[in-house]
């Protein structure tokens, strides 16, 4: 049994953020809500989402593993309007997920589910020496600057600063967020440094990780030298976690 009712706009944000990296995912449903984790096809990035039952207006669920074609679901959810109620309903006999948009007009779609062999993928428990909380808008702007120079980007923590750096054959880009400077408009909300660190990442993946964020969303970024970067943020009570493997420099 699985049936849930929620706001179309909020669910759309979660699905869009998840589908930027993966095409298929397993919804692990139980009485507490929905969890899901998946690796991208190249096994460079991991995405995890958690939607507790409290984010839904109505929720009923027992233990189910539901294999979802995220691309198909994303296209259907895109047809929903923000003022419509979204109803998700599992049809176990037909092996389909029914998606209903309800206002003064009712529209219903059905998505065929895929077989799930294993759904034990979890976000690894890694201890990081450093973390920052930063406004998504400021982080995304720094990525846009770096994109003018190279397709890889270095994230550095050093001397009370969070540095986003990119270097090409001739040009370079650097954005420095200085935690020692107090400013009402400071993009850094939190800065925790245990040791100096630097890691380099594929810029396209970082853009995908943050593509669905709003400017005022707060990103929690965990960093260490040559360690995967972990990025967390919330969407209307739902939690999204992304891990991206570093590019090992010779």
Swiss-Prot record:
Provide the function of this protein: Sliding clamp subunit that acts as a moving platform for DNA processing. Responsible for tethering the catalytic subunit of DNA polymerase and other proteins to DNA during high-speed replication.
Q: How does it assemble?
A: Homotrimer. The subunits circularize to form a toroid; DNA passes through its center. Replication factor C (RFC) is required to load the toroid on the DNA.
Q: Which GO terms describe its molecular function?
A: DNA binding; DNA polymerase processivity factor activity
PANTHER family named in the record: PROLIFERATING CELL NUCLEAR ANTIGEN (PTHR11352:SF0)
Entry-linked CDD domains: PCNA
What's a Pfam family this protein contains? PCNA_N
**A Gene Ontology biological process annotation?**
leading strand elongation
Question: What organism does the UniProt record list as the source?
Answer: Methanococcus maripaludis (strain C7 / ATCC BAA-1331)
Can you tell me which family this protein belongs to? Belongs to the PCNA family.
Which top-level group of life is the source organism from? Answer: Archaea
Show the PROSITE patterns listed in the entry.
PCNA_1
Its recorded name reads DNA polymerase sliding clamp
Keywords annotated in UniProt: DNA replication, DNA-binding
């Amino acid at each position: 049994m699985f049936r849930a009712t929620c706001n179309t706009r909020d669910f759309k944000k979660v699905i869009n953020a998840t589908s930027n990296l993966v095409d298929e995912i397993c919804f692990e449903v139980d009485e507490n809500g929905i969890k899901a984790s998946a690796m991208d096809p190249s096994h460079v990035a991991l995405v995890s989402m958690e939607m507790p039952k409290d984010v839904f207006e109505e929720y009923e669920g027992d233990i189910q593993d539901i294999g979802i074609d995220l691309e198909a679901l994303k296209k259907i959810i895109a047809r929903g309007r923000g003022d419509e109620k979204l109803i998700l309903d599992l049809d176990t006999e037909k092996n389909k997920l029914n998606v209903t948009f309800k206002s003064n007009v009712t529209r219903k779609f059905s998505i065929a589910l895929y077989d799930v062999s294993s759904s034990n993928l979890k976000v690894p428990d890694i201890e990081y020496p450093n973390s920052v909380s930063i406004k998504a808008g400021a982080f995304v702007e720094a990525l846009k600057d770096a994109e003018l120079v190279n397709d890889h980007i270095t994230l550095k923590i050093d001397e009370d600063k969070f540095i986003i750096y990119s270097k090409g054959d001739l040009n370079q880009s650097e954005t420095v967020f200085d935690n020692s400077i107090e400013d009402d408009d400071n993009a850094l909300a939190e800065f925790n440094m245990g040791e100096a660190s630097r890691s380099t990442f594929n810029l396209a993946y970082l853009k995908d990780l943050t593509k669905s964020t709003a400017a005022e969303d707060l990103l929690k970024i965990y960093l260490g030298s040559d360690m995967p970067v972990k990025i967390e943020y919330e969407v209307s009570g739902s939690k999204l976690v992304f891990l991206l493997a570093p590019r090992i420099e010779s």
